[in-house]
Amino acid sequence: CAKKRNWCGKTEDCCCPMKCVYAWYNEQGSCQSTISALWKKC
């Protein structure tokens, strides 16, 4: 997993929750799923 403040470049990146959680929270990433859904998908 990359640094937690990195953006989600691809849907697969969201399989690393802490990589994208901050970007998702700030609506900076391309992941639009909820955090709980990220865990379930991966």
Swiss-Prot record:
One of its GO terms (cellular component) is extracellular region. Keywords: Disulfide bond, Ion channel impairing toxin, Knottin, Neurotoxin, Secreted, Toxin, Voltage-gated sodium channel impairing toxin. It holds the Pfam family Atracotoxin. It comes from the Eukaryota. Its main location: secreted. It is found in: Secreted. Expressed by the venom gland. GO terms for molecular function: sodium channel inhibitor activity; toxin activity. Disulfide bonds join C1-C15, C8-C20, C14-C31, C16-C42. The keyword Cell wall biogenesis/degradation does not apply. The keyword Secreted applies. Belongs to the neurotoxin 06 (delta-actx) family. The presence of a 'disulfide through disulfide knot' structurally defines this protein as a knottin. Inhibits tetrodotoxin-sensitive voltage-gated sodium channels (Nav) by binding to site 3. Slows the inactivation, and causes a prolongation of action potential duration resulting in repetitive firing in autonomic and motor nerve fibers. Does not depolarize the resting potential. Does not affect tetrodotoxin-resistant sodium channels. This lethal neurotoxin is active on both insect and mammalian voltage-gated sodium channels. Is the sole lethal toxin in male and female A.versutus venom. This is Delta-hexatoxin-Hv1a.
